């Protein structure tokens, strides 16, 4: 019988990306892959879109909140139901291990796997642990982290960032769509790419709409998340969502304006791409993006601008500073030791799974 591995994680793209990097490697090596998540969540959408040979198992999910809400009462029952469903799924599948990328949907499968004696491996991308992973850590065999953790946690392995970006633009697939975009852009202007992510695109969209003069100073690429804004015109390309075109657009840009999500930041670091970070504040997140942005700025990888300070004047000043010191930023990024290849992590995870199985 083939070996089986169970993945979980969802709620945002960032809680799915690493799973989608690892899954094809397990499939190639003959593993049977299953995924537990929310059928209405982005994890189901991304798995379906990938076309990978993965069996998806839907469970009830409840959001984990750090504040009082009457919804917490209803969500207690949803989480309990999700735990029972996870116990049934895992008992039936009998996988060799579970790998979790975090998000509130991941807690019931992690707890269930531990209760059934299955090795549990989890991954934390941010500078500090989210609530879901704080809970999951108690049940984990090993936690892999992108950042070094300040707390001395016995089950943590500092990994660095796992990303599969193309460092060489010549490796990227040719795109007729990209060539069409270039027809509308000026070679005399710098090209800026705005990436807001699933939670933070609106502010960038509004900033670009409110300041049409930006198009006179730069070529603008705006990944909006909103198909109603799609547009290709002089010095402006607005698109709601990209997949195969994502990295070619990153390579095409002279500078990327991004939120503070860990996955995107480390992709930019791996590409040594000049970038400005406008992190989500504590009113829109738990503060993890502020921590990530501060870390990147202190390391000399990037410059940050707080969302309340995102005015045209401040933006132009940030652009001028970044381009003036571009060589310094790029040299610092090229010298980083914080990037790991997917193959490196896959081999490490496989070895840790084997060790955990032998120790049972």
Curated annotation (Swiss-Prot):
Catalytic activity: Mur2Ac(oyl-L-Ala-gamma-D-Glu-L-Lys-D-Ala-D-Ala)-di-trans,octa-cis-undecaprenyl diphosphate + UDP-N-acetyl-alpha-D-glucosamine = beta-D-GlcNAc-(1->4)-Mur2Ac(oyl-L-Ala-gamma-D-Glu-L-Lys-D-Ala-D-Ala)-di-trans,octa-cis-undecaprenyl diphosphate + UDP + H(+)
Pathway: Cell wall biogenesis; peptidoglycan biosynthesis
Annotated residues for binding of UDP-N-acetyl-alpha-D-glucosamine: 198, 289
Topological category with respect to the lipid bilayer: Peripheral membrane protein
EC number: 2.4.1.227
InterPro entries the record matches: GlcNAc_MurG, Glyco_trans_28_C, GlycoTrans_28_N
Keyword list, A-Z: Cell cycle, Cell division, Cell membrane, Cell shape, Cell wall biogenesis/degradation, Glycosyltransferase, Membrane, Peptidoglycan synthesis, Transferase
Molecular functions per Gene Ontology: undecaprenyldiphospho-muramoylpentapeptide beta-N-acetylglucosaminyltransferase activity
Family: Belongs to the glycosyltransferase 28 family. MurG subfamily.
Protein's recorded name: UDP-N-acetylglucosamine--N-acetylmuramyl-(pentapeptide) pyrophosphoryl-undecaprenol N-acetylglucosamine transferase
Lineage per the UniProt record: Bacteria, Bacillati, Bacillota, Bacilli, Lactobacillales
Gene name for this UniProt entry: murG
């Amino acid at each position: 019988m083939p070996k089986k591995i169970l993945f979980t994680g969802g709620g945002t793209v960032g809680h799915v990306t690493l799973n989608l990097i690892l899954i094809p490697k397990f499939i190639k090596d003959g593993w049977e892959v299953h995924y537990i998540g929310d059928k209405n969540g982005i994890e189901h959408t991304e798995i379906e879109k990938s076309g990978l040979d993965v069996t998806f198992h839907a469970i009830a999910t409840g959001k984990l909140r750090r504040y009082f809400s009457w919804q917490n009462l209803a969500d207690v029952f949803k989480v309990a139901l999700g735990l029972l469903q996870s116990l049934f799924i895992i008992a039936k599948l009998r996988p060799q291990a579970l790998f979790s990328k975090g998000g509130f949907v991941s807690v019931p499968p992690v707890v269930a796997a531990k209760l059934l004696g299955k090795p549990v491996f989890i991954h934390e991308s941010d500078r500090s642990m989210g609530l879901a992973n704080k809970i999951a850590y108690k049940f984990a065999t090993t936690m892999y982290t992108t950042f070094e953790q300040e707390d001395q946690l016995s089950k943590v392995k500092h990994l660095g960032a796992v990303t599969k970006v193309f460092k060489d633009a010549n490796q990227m697939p040719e795109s007729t769509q990209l060539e069409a975009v270039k027809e509308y852009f000026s070679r005399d202007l710098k090209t800026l790419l705005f990436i807001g992510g699933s939670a933070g695109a609106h502010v960038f969209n509004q900033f670009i709409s409110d300041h049409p003069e930006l198009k006179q100073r730069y070529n603008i690429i705006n990944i909006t998340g909103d198909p109603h804004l799609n547009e290709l015109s002089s010095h402006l390309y607005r698109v709601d969502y990209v997949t195969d075109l994502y990295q070619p657009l990153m390579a095409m840009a002279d500078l990327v304006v991004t939120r503070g999500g860990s996955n995107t930041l480390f992709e930019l670091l791996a590409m040594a791409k000049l970038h400005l970070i406008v992190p989500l504040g504590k009113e829109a997140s738990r503060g993890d993006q502020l921590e990530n942005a501060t870390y990147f700025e202190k390391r000399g990888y990037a410059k940050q601008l707080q969302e309340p300070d995102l005015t045209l004047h401040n933006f132009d000043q940030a652009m001028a500073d970044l381009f003036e010191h571009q060589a310094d930023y790029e040299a610092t990024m090229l010298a980083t030791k914080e990037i790991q290849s997917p193959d490196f992590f896959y081999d490490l995870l496989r070895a840790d799974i084997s060790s955990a199985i032998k120790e049972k």
